[in-house]
């Protein structure tokens, strides 16, 4: 697994920080986005482990910090669920502009709920995995 630090801008102009993990010995067959849990970061052990497993299966995976968390700009106190959805859309736009649109969204806890909602608006998404997501 080789991680590459990347940055992209959300619709509020905040620079979001991410890590793009690519398979070691081949080009990615597909791309995925990993959305972390509430107040966590892209560096959460679960995020790293899931990213590793997906990259070993041929996925390029972008894990990023939501606005105001980790290394991303912005004030966390000014964020809400809608801003999380917008951050996921910004991550997808980054992949589309630089690689190809994501076909898989993965989220943990609140990130899982966010990918369920965001993925329903993205034509490129073929699968969504929500881990411990609070959603009815």
Regions found by a protein language model. Name each.
Residues 1-27:
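N-terminal cap/lid segment of alpha/beta-hydrolase-fold proteins
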Residues 28-37:
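Short beta-strand element of the alpha/beta-hydrolase
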Residues 38-51, 66:
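The serine-hydrolase catalytic nucleophile loop
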Residues 40-41, 67-72, 136:
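Active-site loop signature of alpha/beta-hydrolase-fold enzymes
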Residues 69-100:
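Catalytic nucleophile-loop/oxyanion-hole region of alpha/beta-hydrolase
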Residues 91-136:
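Primarily recognizes the serine-hydrolase "nucleophile elbow" in alpha/beta-hydrolase
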């Amino acid at each position: 697994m080789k991680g590459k630090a990347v940055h992209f801008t959300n619709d509020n102009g905040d620079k979001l920080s991410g890590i793009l993990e690519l398979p070691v010995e081949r080009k990615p067959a597909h791309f995925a986005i990993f959305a972390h849990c509430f107040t966590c970061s892209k560096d959460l052990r679960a995020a790293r482990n899931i990213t590793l497993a997906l990259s070993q299966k041929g996925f390029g995976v972008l894990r990023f910090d939501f606005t105001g968390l980790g290394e991303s700009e912005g004030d966390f106190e000014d964020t809400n669920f809608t801003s999380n959805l917008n951050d996921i859309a910004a991550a997808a736009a980054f992949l589309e502009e630089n690689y190809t649109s994501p076909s898989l969204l993965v989220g943990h806890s609140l990130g899982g709920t966010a990918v369920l909602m965001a993925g329903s608006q993205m034509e490129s998404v073929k699968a969504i995995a929500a881990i411990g997501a609070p959603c009815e």
